[in-house]
Amino acid sequence: MLEVFFLGTGGIMPTRERNVPAIALRYKGEIILFDAGEGTIRQMNTAKLSPMKVDKIFITHFHGDHYLGIPALIQTMNLWDRQKPLHIYGPKYTFQFVQNLLNSGFFRPGFDIHVHELGETRLKFGDYEIWSFKVEHGIPALGYVFKEKDRRGKFLKEKLREYGLEEGPILGKLEREGKIEWNGRIIRLEDVTGPRRKGLKIVYTGDTEPCERVKLFSERADLLIHEATYLNPGDRGDSYHSTVEEACDTARRAKVKLLALFHRAFRYSYEDYVEEALKICESLGVRAVVPRDFDVITFKSGTWELRNLLEERE
């Protein structure tokens, strides 16, 4: 199971109804943060997500609405006596900006902070990988892919009977080692399992104008979280942002299963934006949602569901 928490869905500045960008992925007990705008620690507290379970923060770029929540996160971790290291990843200048943040007050964390400046790369972490790719925002900026490793197929009962195998430690050994000797025969894992199951693929663009690299890295993603700051090109002007139609076009061409539109400009109310945005997506044949703060998309057993944490508590 994987959960995607939309802690902040607005852009540029906070409003009464939405905070600035922060996306949290919860996977096998770990919380991975993508961007951390101001107020992210408060949003995490409201969502009941512990910052102590965050080992990695991936920053897309250094405009304030995407990174100014980092100092408060670090200080909170320190107050809670964090011991394990924190890893912060981002584009060129990440080391410089993190150093500036840590030097901005009378404060020194009691745990190690490791800073990683990335270009386009592929990072491996146990059961998943993070890919970084360049986007177009007028400054050094990255998008990210969370890619779960493919999983083995399900054990086939008829094949287990054929080879005289039963559930228990022997199947655990077969799964760990890939093959075993049993009753004088060599049995391979693929002999008794179905087709391998594709791991989940989640893509987060950060801020970007339309670019082909987003389409390339989003191919057949389960979820594409694409900025769609503006409803129409006339509102955009010369800014390096995308419209709803441009985000939908990318998702359609990449054959994305689900598109989440975020980072809408503060000029739009949620009601006005979502009505127009979903009309555009429907006209292009794209399945889409417009998350609010504290919406959660849960992926489990090949399906997904959307819920809102605050509504659940009413």
Swiss-Prot record:
UniProt keyword terms in alphabetical order: Endonuclease, Hydrolase, Metal-binding, Nuclease, tRNA processing, Zinc
InterPro entries according to UniProt: Metallo-B-lactamas, RibonucZ/Hydroxyglut_hydro, RNase_Z/BN
Positions bound to Zn(2+) 2: D65, H66, D207, H263
Annotated Zn(2+) 1 binding sites: H61, H63, H137, D207
Reactions the enzyme catalyzes: Endonucleolytic cleavage of RNA, removing extra 3' nucleotides from tRNA precursor, generating 3' termini of tRNAs. A 3'-hydroxy group is left at the tRNA terminus and a 5'-phosphoryl group is left at the trailer molecule
Cofactor note: Binds 2 Zn(2+) ions.
Pfam families: Lactamase_B_2 (PF12706)
E.C. number(s) listed in UniProt: 3.1.26.11
GO molecular function, one term: zinc ion binding
Database matches in SMART domains: Lactamase_B
CDD domains, per the entry: RNaseZ_ZiPD-like_MBL-fold (cd07717)
Cofactor(s) needed by this chain: Zn(2+)
SUPFAM superfamilies: Metallo-hydrolase/oxidoreductase
Active site (record annotation): D65 (proton acceptor)
tRNA processing is among the record's keywords: yes
Recorded superkingdom: Archaea
Entry similarity comment: Belongs to the RNase Z family.
NCBIfam families reported in the protein's UniProt record: PRK00055.1-3, RNase_Z
Purpose of the protein: Zinc phosphodiesterase, which displays some tRNA 3'-processing endonuclease activity. Probably involved in tRNA maturation, by removing a 3'-trailer from precursor tRNA.
Complex formation: Homodimer.
Name of this chain's protein: Ribonuclease Z
Organism: Thermococcus kodakarensis (strain ATCC BAA-918 / JCM 12380 / KOD1) (Pyrococcus kodakaraensis (strain KOD1))
